[in-house]
């Protein structure tokens, strides 16, 4: 795919020239009147469309963009659609957005989120991408704790393979962190968010300080110029440490403190970390960037290939693209496409509806998905029911073998931007029936520890997933589950020594550690105090803060990382409220310490106030970074140090599970079932059963009670705590507490679910919006008062 392309120009990051549509394609894009997303208000049963995609729900939201889960109408494949409001971005941010799209177009690796289609109008940009249903690695670690080294190795091999592939193409990511590592349905890694990526040339230094501070290389804090790959290598070292230990190697209560620790390069080695893993970390976390290992060298490391002696990790070789797959071509011809436009779109890399359909026809969203393609007919009769008629030149396609029902104008108009068309209720119903239940996909996951990076015969297609790694999502016994799910290791205490377990290792890059070899298979049930820690002194009199910043401040930029539906995610957290004080975690999210930022963004106000970089004055924005509800074991860290806030210098992403007609904050009606629908729908509602899915649960929120009795108890407790709620599904409530616009306002879901393989039901909590402190306070109170 790359052989047909000219090298990507390195964008001058200070250049503010207004970009043009030519950034996205060599041919002019169609204008906004070519695309009409239907308003959901046109019919109670209709869902909005963008081109050939039915928009299902919002799964992420920011200041200037939304991410929606969508289904490709012709193939039935799920995709993530990033909808970006270009009118809200300045010229510099637009340039970075277009650069991100250009870079995504040339990347074709099984562990990198695949771009399928780009739809552009005068005011909006739609990026249709691979949907990673497993969520973020960050959330997985919060829910399940650290990974065993065997599992971490499988994931890390995929990560290194993908990043090394980028470096092969002279592309540096510059924002590698656990939040930008997604998991697909088979628990394989998908690297996302190339918003800060750029092309590099050795000798032509980059000088932009961007990324997440805990993952940032020391030379970035020092304001030094860099080639590119070495900053990714440092970030990979932080990621490896995070996977294996469940905590960050460098942390602090504010940016100044974090900077000092990174520049010292000291980090603790947990007692359970193997010597091989420790030695590998020393190749990543080296203060001198010129002495840092290359990824080609890292691939040959002993730890990387344990259990893979016959399959040593090697640089990924991108296969030649297969643009003449007869099976897909014939299917598309039967839809009404012509062979000429199929070849033109593929060879020209148009990333239009034709190319997207071809890619999706060969794309497997899961190892469990068979080769059978279920195509959805688009009969002409449906046009009579259309509330948003298509342009006159657009003729509906059919799965009939007759290719005459096909428009021809887009061959002359360049890359086609699909129009939005209304479809009959029957067609929508058929599409809904084709959707594979999440629980089926979850329960059918394979368990294997190998992580081979296969050759892909086509960009983004038949991308055989690496053999899935073991999933720890299965419900364990009570004792095992509690200890294994105890989230992340204790943060190194400031100004005081921590209790050690016989041996302490303070590792400095290049120095010899005194850590003895330890088995990677240490029982997760071992007491938490048996952890190595370091005492880090703070020097408040030292120079603080970031390196010299650019003159042009950056505005928030859109992230193209596709988000997943949080409901069925393996990382949807339950509130653990049993027993004494909850455990603490190193992994608060939504705080500035975890925010990706650019050099132009200033933090002097917070530093002058000596506030922790996770605790700042509350933002009045309605787009706060509401995330998944977290288990009680992660709450006291927020209580003691961090408060979630909207400090992301990109989009403050917010996961929502709400109807399309809802936006921001709305008043919820207490206990009202949707009044629309016919008798059949009401009957189906009455007969609905709780979903069976994996989620983090505690003994306090599980019960052998009937689901309906549990719902009555939940409503009773909600009413007693002055919470408003709305019945979204039979066993799911949308809840609200506090005053909209105030810090105490929070929205969350409560759902009664069946625990797989157990004769128990559990209550799943998931935060939608509001600060983690507000959510923790009300959710813990409700969980404690439930009599289940």
From Swiss-Prot:
Outcome of substituting residue 596 to A: Loss of membrane dissociation and binding to YWHAZ
Active site per UniProt: 175
Ranges of Low complexity composition bias in the record: 511-525
Protein name: Serine/threonine-protein kinase MARK2
PROSITE patterns (alphabetical): KA1, PROTEIN_KINASE_ATP, PROTEIN_KINASE_DOM, PROTEIN_KINASE_ST, UBA
InterPro entries: KA1/Ssp2_C, KA1_dom, Kinase-like_dom_sf, MARK1-4_cat, Prot_kinase_dom, Protein_kinase_ATP_BS, Ser/Thr_kinase_AS, UBA
Sequence positions bearing Phosphoserine: 40, 91-93, 212, 274, 409, 456, 486, 493, 569, 571, 592, 619, 722
GO BP of this protein: autophagy of mitochondrion; axon development; establishment of cell polarity; establishment or maintenance of cell polarity regulating cell shape; establishment or maintenance of epithelial cell apical/basal polarity; intracellular signal transduction; microtubule cytoskeleton organization; mitochondrion localization
Cofactor: Mg(2+)
Modification(s) after translation: Autophosphorylated. Phosphorylated at Thr-208 by STK11/LKB1 in complex with STE20-related adapter-alpha (STRADA) pseudo kinase and CAB39. Phosphorylation at Thr-208 by TAOK1 activates the kinase activity, leading to phosphorylation and detachment of MAPT/TAU from microtubules. Phosphorylation at Ser-212 by GSK3-beta (GSK3B) inhibits the kinase activity. Phosphorylation by CaMK1 promotes activity and is required to promote neurite outgrowth.
Comp. bias regions, Polar residues: 27-45, 418-432, 467-486, 495-504
Membrane association type: Peripheral membrane protein
Subunit field text: Homodimer. Interacts with PAK5; leading to inhibit the protein kinase activity. Interacts with MAPT/TAU. Interacts with MTCL1 isoform 1; the interaction is direct and increases MARK2 microtubule-binding ability. Interacts (when phosphorylated at Thr-596) with YWHAZ. Interacts with YWHAB, YWHAG and YWHAQ. (Microbial infection) In case of infection, interacts with H.pylori CagA, leading to inhibit kinase activity and junctional and polarity defects.
Region (Disordered): 1-46, 373-632
KA1 domain span: 739-788
Documented EC number(s): 2.7.11.1, 2.7.11.26
Organism in which the protein naturally occurs: Homo sapiens
Compartments, record wording: Cell membrane; Cytoplasm; Lateral cell membrane; Cytoplasm, Cytoskeleton
């Amino acid at each position: 795919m790359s052989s047909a392309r000219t090298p990507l120009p390195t964008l001058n990051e200070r250049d503010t020239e207004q970009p043009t549509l030519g950034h996205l394609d060599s041919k002019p894009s169609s204008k906004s009147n070519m695309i009409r997303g239907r308003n959901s208000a046109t019919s109670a049963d209709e869902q909005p469309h963008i081109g050939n995609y039915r928009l299902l729900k919002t799964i992420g939201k920011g200041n200037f963009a939304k991410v929606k889960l969508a289904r490709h109408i012709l193939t039935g494949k799920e995709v993530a659609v990033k909808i970006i409001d270009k009118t809200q971005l300045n010229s510099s941010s637009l340039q970075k957005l277009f650069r991100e799209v250009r870079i995504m177009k040339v990347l074709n690796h099984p562990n990198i989120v695949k771009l399928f289609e780009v739809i552009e109008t005068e005011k909006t940009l739609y990026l249709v991408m691979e949907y990673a249903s497993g969520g973020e690695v960050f959330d997985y670690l919060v829910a399940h704790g650290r990974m065993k080294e065997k599992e971490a190795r499988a994931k890390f091999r995929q990560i290194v393979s993908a990043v090394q592939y980028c470096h092969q193409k002279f592309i540096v990511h510059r924002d590698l962190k656990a939040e930008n590592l997604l998991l697909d349905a088979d628990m394989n890694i998908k690297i996302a968010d190339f918003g800060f990526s750029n092309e590099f040339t050795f000798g032509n230094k980059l000088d932009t300080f961007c990324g997440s501070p805990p993952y940032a290389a020391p030379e970035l804090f020092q304001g030094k110029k860099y080639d590119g790959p070495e900053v990714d290598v440092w970030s990979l070292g932080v990621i490896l440490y995070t996977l294996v230990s469940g905590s960050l190697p460098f942390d602090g209560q504010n940016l100044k403190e974090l900077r000092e620790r990174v520049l010292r390069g000291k980090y603790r080695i947990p007692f359970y970390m193997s010597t091989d893993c420790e030695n590998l970390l020393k190749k990543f976390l080296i203060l001198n960037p010129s002495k840092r290992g290359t990824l080609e060298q890292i691939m040959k490391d002993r730890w990387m290939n344990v259990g893979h002696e016959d399959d040593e990790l090697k640089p990924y070789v991108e296969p030649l693209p297969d643009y003449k797959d007869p099976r897909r071509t014939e299917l598309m011809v039967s839809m009404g496409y012509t062979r000429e436009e199929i070849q033109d779109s593929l060879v020209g890399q148009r990333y239009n509806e034709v190319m997207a359909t071809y890619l999706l026809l060969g794309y497997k969203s899961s190892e469990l998905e068979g080769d059978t393609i279920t195509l959805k007919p688009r009969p002409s009769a449906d046009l009579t029911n259309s509330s948003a008629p298509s342009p006159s030149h657009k003729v509906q396609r059919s799965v009939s073998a007759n290719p005459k029902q096909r428009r021809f104008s887009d061959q002359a108009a360049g890359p086609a931007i699909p129009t939005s068309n209304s479809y009959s209720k029957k067609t929508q119903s058929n599409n809904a029936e084709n959707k594979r239940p999440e629980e089926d996909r979850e329960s059918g996951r394979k368990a294997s520890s190998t992580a081979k990076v296969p050759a892909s015969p086509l960009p983004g297609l038949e991308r055989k997933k690496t053999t899935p790694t073991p999933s720890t999502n299965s419900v364990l016994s009570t004792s095992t589950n509690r200890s294994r799910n105890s989230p992340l290791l204790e943060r190194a205490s400031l100004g005081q020594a921590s209790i050690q377990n016989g041996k302490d290792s303070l590792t400095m890059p290049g120095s010899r550690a005194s850590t003895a070899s330890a088995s990677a298979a240490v029982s997760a049930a071992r007491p938490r105090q048996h952890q190595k820690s370091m005492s880090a002194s703070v020097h408040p009199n030292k120079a603080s803060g970031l390196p010299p910043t650019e003159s042009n401040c950056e505005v928030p930029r859109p992230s193209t990382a596709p988000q997943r539906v949080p409901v069925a995610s393996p990382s949807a957290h339950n509130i653990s409220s049993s027993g004494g004080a909850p455990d603490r975690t190193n992994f608060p999210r939504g705080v500035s310490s975890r925010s990706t930022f650019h050099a132009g963004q200033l933090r002097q106000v917070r530093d002058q106030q000596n506030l922790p970089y996770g605790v700042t004055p509350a933002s009045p924005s309605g787009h706060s970074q509401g995330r998944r509800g977290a288990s009680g074991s992660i709450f006291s860290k927020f209580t003691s140090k961090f408060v979630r806030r909207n400090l992301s210098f990109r989009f403050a992403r917010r996961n929502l599970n709400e109807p399309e007609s809802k936006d921001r904050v709305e008043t919820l009606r207490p206990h009202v079932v949707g009044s629309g629908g016919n008798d059949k729908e009401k009957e189906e509602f009455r007969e609905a059963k709780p979903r069976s899915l994996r989620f983090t649960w505690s003994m306090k929120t599980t019960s052998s009670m009937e689901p309906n009795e549990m719902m009555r108890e939940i409503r009773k407790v909600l009413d007693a705590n002055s919470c408003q709620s709305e019945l979204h599904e039979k066993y799911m409530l949308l809840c609200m507490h506090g005053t909209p616009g105030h810090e105490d306002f929070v929205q969350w879901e409560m759902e009664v679910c069946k625990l797989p393989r157990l004769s128990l039901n559990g209550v799943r909590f998931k935060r939608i919006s509001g600060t983690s402190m507000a959510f923790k306070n009300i959710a813990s109170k409700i969980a404690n008062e439930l009599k289940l």
